[in-house]
Regions:
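Glycine-rich phosphate/nucleotide-binding loop
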Residues: 80
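Switch II (G3) loop of P-loop NTPases
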Residues: 31-40
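ATP-dependent small-molecule kinase phosphotransfer cores
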Residues: 1-29
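NTP-dependent small-molecule kinase module
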Residues: 18-30, 44-53, 57-69, 83-134
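Flexible, glycine- and charge-enriched loops at secondary-structure boundaries
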Residues: 6-9, 71, 101
Length: 134
């Protein structure tokens, strides 16, 4: 797996950067990168903000089981990514996903509006990173 990641992650990172630049040239106010290995691959360096959607392990596991995963598959998927503590530490926005989908959607919409407001008012987005500002 490490060999495969060493071969693919740099190329994927270049393609991501090209796509982001293309979107911005076309006038998109922002681009969203949804990649479970973003931190591990170093792609967070091309992001103005890092969002982490968090839920307790029992909730995450239950949702994975409902999608047909086994607990072993769930554990393997989580082990292949950065630790949850590391994701939380690097995040500029943490969204609580322990509740229902409507509550999560409302939180995402609120943070997205705030982010777009920052993008519109500043050519260089600087999102606060302290937990108190999340």
């Amino acid at each position: 797996l490490k060999f495969l990641e060493a071969v693919t992650h740099p190329r994927i990172g270049c393609l991501l950067q090209e796509q982001i630049e293309l979107l911005l040239q076309q006038g998109a106010p922002a681009a969203v990168l949804d990649a479970p290995v973003m931190l591990k691959a170093g792609w967070d360096a091309m992001c103005d903000a890092i969002w982490f959607v968090d839920a307790p392990r029992p909730t995450r596991l239950q949702r994975a089981l409902q999608r047909g995963w086994t607990e072993a598959q769930f554990d393997a998927r989580e082990a292949a990514q950065e630790s949850l503590d590391e994701k939380r530490r690097k995040a500029t926005v943490v969204i609580d996903n322990a509740g229902d989908s409507e509550a999560t959607a409302a939180a995402v919409a609120r943070h997205w509006r705030q982010f777009l407001d920052q993008v519109r008012t500043s050519p260089c987005v600087s999102v606060p990173s302290s937990p108190a500002d999340r």
